[in-house]
């Protein structure tokens, strides 16, 4: 059984639904012909690249549902179906790849080069839970998630044109923060059944400049829910 952190699920969601101003990610796809009862499909990113996120999976041209029909094994760059496929079925996996990324499950390191920004990280700052019945019932966890957005001050390599307008520094951090809230409001169903019940904890507040990282900083906070967190079954 693969360990599946809620942060891993959210990283995949954000990488898929938020456009990187620095365009570090490109799209590619792999095609397979399933063997009898095959469940695991290993991806083959371009040499020097690694898996960023899964965009879509089809089996005989029918879309499969992420976290319901299959899960992602990021460490081994695999898509794993919960139920074995039939011999001869055509599987097409479309995914993002890159030599680096910009959305991570860990906090930004102060040693990062300026070209590593903008950067987003995800923190679980609390996770109460309750058993939904007797001792055999599942536990529903309610993680409180904090998403940090880090952007550098205005300089030549930190000004980005988005939709015809230029963004940098605090302005860019705020723009990304609201695109994150929009992504959850518009695409929450992509998280189900792994996570559900998105509930925002206010809109992105103004925060002071971070002297340690020399970055502008915004946060997005919300609650969500999930059963058997950390497990694929």
Locations of the language-model features?
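Small/polar-rich, solvent-exposed N-terminal microdomains that initiate assembly or binding
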Residues: 1-27, 44-80, 94-136, 187-195, ...
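Extracellular/virion structural assembly segments
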Residues: 19-24, 97, 135-142, 150-187, ...
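Surface-exposed ligand/attachment interfaces on beta-rich extracellular proteins
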Residues: 31-47
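Short, ordered beta-strand-loop transition motifs
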Residues: 33-38, 69-76, 208-214
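Surface-exposed, short loops/turns at beta-strand junctions within beta-sandwich domains
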Residues: 84-87
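Acidic-leaning, charged glycine-interspersed low-complexity segments
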Residues: 115-121, 174-231
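Oligomerization/assembly interface segments of phage tail-like spikes and tubes
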Residues: 137-157, 213-228
């Amino acid at each position: 059984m693969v360990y599946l952190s809620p942060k891993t699920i959210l990283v995949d969601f954000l990488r898929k639904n938020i456009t990187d101003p620095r365009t570090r990610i490109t799209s590619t796809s792999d095609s397979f012909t399933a063997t009898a009862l095959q469940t695991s499909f290993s991806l083959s990113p371009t040499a020097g690249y690694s898996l960023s996120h899964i965009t879509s999976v089809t089996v005989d041209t029918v879309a499969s549902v992420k976290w319901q029909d299959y899960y992602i094994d990021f460490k081994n760059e695999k898509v794993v179906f919960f139920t074995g496929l039939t011999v001869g079925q055509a599987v097409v996996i479309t995914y993002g790849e890159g030599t680096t990324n910009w959305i991570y499950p860990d906090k930004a390191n102060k040693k990062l080069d300026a070209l590593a920004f903008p950067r987003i990280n995800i923190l679980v700052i609390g996770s109460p839970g309750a058993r939904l019945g007797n001792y055999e019932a599942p536990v529903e966890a309610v993680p409180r998630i904090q998403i940090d957005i880090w952007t550098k001050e205005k300089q030549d390599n930190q000004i980005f044109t988005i939709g015809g307008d230029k963004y940098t520094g605090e302005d860019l951090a705020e723009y990304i923060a609201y695109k994150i809230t929009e992504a959850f409001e518009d695409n929450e169903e992509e998280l189900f059944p792994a996570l559900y019940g998105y509930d925002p904890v206010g809109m992105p507040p103004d925060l002071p400049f971070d002297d340690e990282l020399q970055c502008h900083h915004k946060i997005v906070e919300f609650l969500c829910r999930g059963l058997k967190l950390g497990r694929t079954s």
